[in-house]
Swiss-Prot record:
InterPro entries: NPIP, NPIP_N. Pfam families: NPIP. It comes from the Eukaryota. Belongs to the NPIP family. It comes from Homo sapiens. This is Nuclear pore complex-interacting protein family member A7.
Length: 369
């Protein structure tokens, strides 16, 4: 071929019948049968094409099988794959299941959000309608104000419930405390009653006689009329010791003349002076306990007492609240004979010399001890 080209170049590019003959003869001599190069080349090309088709078919079938395996995974664990591949498949399957669960959760949340948004849109539409209606009537409110009012009402209701519950708890605690104090007071009252009963049983029978009360009434009347303090030793026990020796009764009679009352005390009913005892703190001469006192201060405007200087024991003038109906001739009258004395009563008091005073609810203190 190159020879032909060189021959053409050497010949100056002119083609003649001679040159064509030379080429044809060379071709016939070198390549018998065809111009392509002969049968060996055809055989090689044919074999190569057949092998290429086979390789292409093998590759295509392998790819198809791989694709089918990917689409339809085998349920059999012993499919000839290695452990690494099986673990990878399992992890992929779990991952796919996890992705599916996550997608379901996402869709659920999306539905919830969509529901809330739709409800809010519906509320906004209703609020818009209400606002349009109220705008005509001169009113206007928004969804925020409505929600704020609802929240305030809920808070107020919750606060009221809390206050009621707290008040109930405080009331229960107060009632419990009151019940405790009542129990303590009742126990103290019971102890006081027991103590009173115990000491009342220890009092001597002579102190429980009516004479003791009469003597105490006389002492109270003496204290009220004279202004001296009341001495608790004027009891039956002290009077018993003092009544043993008495001076003779005085002959002088004291007559008290007042604008509204005139008293004439008989000689047998005069209160005799008592001798001093061991527990007497008064420094009184034994000849007479009823002695005139020094002149006192000027009486006030509301003082109706007219106290003579010669004697302190005298009846008071009747007051506005005095309901006693006492005969004016004598307030100190002898008492009727008392009960016979008991075995432990050593008082020897004649019945005509016991001081009897009129009963007055504001001037008499009866001791029950």
């Amino acid at each position: 071929m190159f020879c032909c080209l060189g021959y053409e170049w050497l010949s100056g590019g002119c083609t003649t019948w001679h040159s064509a003959w030379v080429i044809n003869t060379l071709a016939d001599h070198r390549h018998r049968g065809t111009d392509f190069g002969g049968s060996p080349w055809l055989l090689i090309i044919t074999v190569f094409l057949r092998s290429y088709k086979f390789a292409i078919s093998l590759c295509t079938s392998y790819l198809c099988v791989s694709f089918l395996k990917t689409i339809f995974p085998s349920q059999n664990g012993h499919d000839g794959s290695t452990d690494v591949q099986q673990r990878a498949r399992r992890s992929n399957r779990r991952r796919q299941e996890g992705i599916k669960i996550v997608l379901e959760d996402i869709f659920t949340l999306w539905r919830q959000v969509e529901t809330k948004v739709r409800a809010k849109i519906r509320k906004m539409k209703v609020t818009t309608k209400v606002n349009r209606h109220d705008k005509i009537n001169g009113k206007r409110k928004t969804a925020k104000e409505h929600l704020r009012k609802l929240s305030m009402k809920e808070r107020e209701h919750r606060e009221e419930e809390r206050q009621v519950s707290e008040a109930e708890e405080n009331g229960k605690l107060d009632m419990k405390e009151i019940h405790t104090y009542m129990e303590m007071f009742q126990r103290a009252q019971a102890l006081r009653r027991r103590a009173e009963d115990y000491y009342r049983c220890k009092i001597t029978p002579s102190a429980r006689k009516p004479l003791c009360n009469r003597v105490r009434m006389a002492a109270v009347e003496h204290r009220h009329s004279s202004g001296l303090p009341y001495w608790p030793y004027l009891t039956a026990e002290t009077l018993k010791n003092r009544m043993g020796h008495q001076p003779p009764p005085p002959t002088q009679q004291h007559s008290i003349i007042d604008n509204s009352l005139s008293l004439k005390t008989p000689s047998e009913c005069v209160l005799y002076p008592l001798p001093p005892s061991a527990d007497d703190n008064l420094k009184t001469p034994p000849e007479c306990l009823l002695t005139p006192l020094p002149p006192s201060a000027l009486p006030s405007a509301d003082d109706n007492l007219k106290t003579p200087a010669e004697c302190l024991l005298y009846p008071l003038p009747p007051s506005a609240d005095d309901n006693l109906k006492t005969p004016p001739e004598c307030l100190l009258t002898p008492l009727p004979p008392s009960a016979p004395p008991s075995a432990d009563d050593n008082l020897k008091t004649p019945p005509e010399c016991v001081c009897s005073l009129p009963f007055h609810p504001q001037r008499m203190i009866i001791s029950r001890n």
